[in-house]
Amino acid sequence: MPTTVISGFTHNFLGKAPVWYKQVILLFLVINPIVMYLLGPGVAGWLLIGEFIFTLAMALKCYPLLPGGLLAVEALLIGLTSADAVYHEVLTNFPVILLLMFMVAGIYFMKELLLVTFTQILVGVRSKSALSLLFCSAAAVLSAFLDALTVTAVIISVAVGFFSVYHKVASGKGYQQKDHNTNSDDEVIELHREDLENFRAFLRSLLMHGAIGTALGGVATMVGEPQNLLIAKVVGWDFAGFFLHMAPVSIPVLFAGLATCWALEKLRWFGYGGRLPKPVRRVLEEFADNEKARRTKSDQAALWIQAVAAVILVFGLAFHIAEVGLIGLLVIILITSFTGVTDEHQIGKAFQESLPFTSLLVVFFAVVAVIHEQHLFKPIIDYVLALPEGQQPGMFFIANGLLSMISDNVFVATVYISEVKQALDAGSISYEHFQTLAVAINTGTNLPSVATPNGQAAFLFLLTSAIAPLVRLSYGRMVIMALPYTIVMGGVGLYMVTHAF
């Protein structure tokens, strides 16, 4: 415990983050103004990008909003960008912010329906390969309409539900007991420890298959990933137009990804292949039967309302009746009104998952503003645009893919699409070629970016969620488990981008 006010300040700074991490962030904050003064804004800007990527890579040490936010504020103070430029970036990406605020919250109120659906899938399908394929393909289909973050939130809530049920039983308690700490294994009975570890491995593989599924489906439509909406707005595509332009790349990659999913479960490579222990299956089946028996007529009516809202959501997105985030708000209004969720605090819980990430996204946009103000990516863009036209899509795919592996794909896509749009406005490229480059940018940011958690917004969401520590899903483990998918999806995507247009 701190003994002085000064030690209290140092203890409170970035909370429970390791001391070395706090020291590194302080070092960044000290050297940035010095570099700006001695070496100029160009070098300081690139240094800031490197520091920001570091905070994303260290997401398990400290949520990136805090250190990343401090770096963004400092960038404003030392003149790397301006408040007006940040505001302009936020305004440009306002549809993405609306999506995160309301769509993820809207799906929160559909969790009962989705939990029932995924429970039936999990206890009904006994083959792990078939189950993994079903999870991956279900996540892909859902991501095409709901956005990857939303689907990841659903998969996380399902996994947390299943894990907490068995953890209570393994600790010698009934699964209806409310007061239980799933973060601690201290109360777990020795007899159940091996089954609990095997269950963790089983859930880890399902979570990763599901997360990969969100990338497979998310690349295909304008609402699948936050950056898709951004690209669609810049290019001028509607829902159908976006899908048709992406299909030559997204459809072959989908089939290649599903084949990889099946192969990994059969071969049990890269941490996959964990089976559901029989005692755990019995507990989950009993839980599912008990939940079904306890379901009242009121609960059944609520499930019907959620199903109707899901249909309205899909049609609303397909025909683009309103901005995506506003359709999410419609879902919130419909479900809460017709299921009797009237308490303000109960409604507020729906926004807890999405708002920290929304805040982090605004910090991304501050860094994007620095890149724009200092023209940091202009040399790279100019180099690629100077290549023969036939080579440009492939090079954009590779450049976006490599950057998206170490940085967030929303961040990379925002930068590249706006830079290419400037080239279009300047008359350097035709609109048809601009559309081809937009496909390369979208697929380049969506497919190879599964390599690391900081590449995909949904993966970062998974890594920083409640389920990651419960099933021992660390940054390094995610990278290893994503490797085969990265190779297959990146390879097939690059081939299609260079040969399909």
UniProtKB/Swiss-Prot annotation:
It comes from the Bacteria. It holds the Pfam family NhaB. The keyword Ion transport applies. Its main location: membrane. GO terms for cellular component: plasma membrane. It is a multi-pass membrane protein. The chain crosses the membrane at residues 24-44, 46-66, 90-110, 145-165, 206-226, 239-259, 302-319, 351-371, 395-415, 450-470, 478-498. Belongs to the NhaB Na(+)/H(+) (TC 2.A.34) antiporter family. HAMAP family: NhaB. Na(+)/H(+) antiporter that extrudes sodium in exchange for external protons. This is Na(+)/H(+) antiporter NhaB.
